């Protein structure tokens, strides 16, 4: 670690208020047994970072003040801890932010993304809006050869999109994507790349992102001026979508997804509903034999395998989804831009 400085300046949640971030000096961490020290290359802004910026109820309950946040990231290994044989100095990696114990029943059954003893990198502990960070080596995933570090940093949201899509049929199916934030945009692109016969993209009034969805392959784009349920049924000869994916966190979008999915179809939900629990038309779910499923994170590691296959074959148009790249000094501007929504994915480079 001779070339690694002793201290660093990192964006830190210091005050219990909207914004509330400051650049604070921290010691550069040393990797413990089974860990790697990473020099950050790129970290992207996530919806979770916006929740933390707003200091909403979820953030107040989960994020300790003084935490360096940021969890969608890529970087280069600069030191390895005792017992690490899977990584070498110089390796480019991306982080799986769900830190698992690997011993509980959920981990042992292959669901480490919902580990009973798990925590989230950059939420419950220090993350990657910093020049250096440590993670368990198992969470430092090697990236496809030649991948741009900025592209490598978005594997968290791309993986979310793929995990949600694969909760139902994709190849040859009609897939409806409700909510066109960055994850929804990746879902549109990935659904096409994975062989969906038709992709229907739905948002409220973000014309910027609706246009992006069209460029990424959506066959039909719907907005606030459309009767979403009627339009989806018309586009599917009255049957409904085979696989509806809800990314918006809007109660109306969940209702539309349920009512516009075919008999025996799949409704996969990767959303946090911030304004109370949405009403779920359970009679529709029961009598139409709908498969309603909550999605959290990425399967470890089948989602990553699928994602790396798509990236290696250049089937994901990452450059279209990443609309803004800034230096880390522009962190506050980047979060504001992401909140306003006139963007796709915002990436901060170091």
Features from the language model and the residues they span:
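C-terminal hydrophobic helical "lid"/dimerization subdomain
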Residues: 2-8, 39, 226-227, 255-259, ...
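N-terminal glycine-rich cofactor-binding segment
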Residues: 12-30, 47-79, 94, 115-124
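Glycine-rich beta-strand-centered segment in the early N-terminal region that forms part
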Residues: 29-43, 58-105, 144-146
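NAD(P)H dinucleotide-binding glycine-rich loop of Rossmann-like/cofactor-binding domains
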Residues: 62, 99-178
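Mid-domain Rossmann-like dinucleotide-binding core that forms the NAD(H)/NADP(H) cofactor-binding site
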Residues: 145-226, 230
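Glycine-rich phosphate-binding loop and adjacent beta-alpha segment
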Residues: 201, 214, 219, 251-313, ...
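Short amphipathic alpha-helix with an adjacent loop that forms part of the alpha/beta core around
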Residues: 228-238
């Amino acid at each position: 670690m001779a070339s690694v400085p002793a201290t660093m300046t990192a964006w830190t949640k210091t005050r219990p208020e909207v914004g509330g971030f400051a650049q604070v000096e921290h010691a550069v961490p040393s990797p413990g047994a089974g860990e790697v020290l990473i020099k950050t290359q790129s970290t992207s802004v996530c919806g979770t970072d916006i929740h933390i910026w707003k200091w909403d109820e979820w953030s107040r309950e989960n994020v300790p003040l003084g935490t360096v946040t940021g969890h969608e990231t890529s970087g280069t290994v600069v030191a390895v801890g005792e017992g690490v044989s899977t990584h070498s100095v110089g390796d480019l990696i991306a982080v799986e932010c769900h830190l698992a114990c690997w011993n509980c029943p959920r981990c042992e059954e292959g669901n480490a993304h919902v580990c009973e003893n798990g925590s989230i990198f950059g939420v419950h502990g220090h993350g990657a809006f910093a020049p250096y960070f440590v993670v368990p080596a198992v969470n430092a995933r090697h990236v496809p050869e030649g991948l741009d570090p900025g592209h490598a940093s978005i594997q968290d949201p791309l993986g979310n999109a793929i995990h949600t899509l694969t909760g139902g049929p994709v190849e040859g199916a009609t897939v409806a994507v409700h909510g066109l934030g960055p994850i929804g945009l990746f879902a549109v692109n990935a659904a096409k790349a994975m062989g969906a016969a038709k992709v229907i993209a739905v948002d409220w009034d973000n014309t910027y992102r609706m246009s992006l969805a069209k460029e990424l392959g959506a066959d039909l784009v719907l907005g606030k001026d459309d009767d979403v349920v009627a339009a989806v049924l018309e586009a599917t000869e009255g049957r409904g979508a085979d696989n509806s994916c809800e990314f918006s966190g809007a109660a109306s979008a969940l209702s539309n997804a349920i009512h516009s999915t075919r008999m025996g179809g799949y409704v996969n939900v990767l959303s946090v509903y911030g304004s109370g629990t949405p009403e779920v038309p359970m009679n529709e779910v029961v009598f139409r034999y709908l498969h309603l499923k909550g999605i959290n994170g990425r399967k470890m590691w089948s989602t990553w395998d699928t994602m790396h296959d798509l990236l290696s074959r250049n089937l994901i148009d990452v450059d279209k989804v990443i609309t803004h790249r800034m230096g880390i000094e522009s962190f506050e501007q980047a979060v504001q831009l992401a909140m306003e929504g006139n963007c796709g994915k915002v990436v901060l480079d170091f």
